[in-house]
Amino acid sequence: MIISQRPEWDETFQEIARIWASRSTCSRRQVGAVVVKDKHVIGQGYNGVASGKKHCVDGGCPRGMLSYDEVPAGADYNQWPCTSLHAEHNAILNAGLAACAGATIYVTDKPCQQCTNLIEHAKIGRVVIGGRGIVSA
C-alpha cells in the first residue's frame, strides 16, 4: 500500500482537537483543545461542565437558556454565568500545569483573553488555531 498524502503533525493534532470539540455539550459553541509535547498528547479537553453536573444542552447553563436573540436589548450577555470550563482550561488541567512548559496547544477556535492568560501562565510555547494558521503564545 502506498500512502500518497500523509498529514503533517499540525494537521493531525488539529484533527484530534476537532474530535474533542465534538464531545462538547455547550448549547452555543463546541471547542476542543489538545496539549502536545514531543509529538505526544499530554492533555485534551473541550468546553463543558464538570463531570456529573447537568450539561448545558440539558438546561444546566444559565447563559445557555437564552439564545443570542432572546437576550434583552441593552442587557449584558455576561450577566448570566457560564458554568463550564473552556477547552483550553480543561486540556491544561488534564496535562498538569508543570508538564505544559514548552508544549504546543492546538485549539479549534481563538482562545478568549482568560484562556490566553492561562496558556501564557502554563508557559506553553506555541498555539495552533484551527483554520487560522500558527500563532505564537
Where are these regions (language model features)?
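Zinc-dependent deaminase catalytic domain
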Residues: 1-137
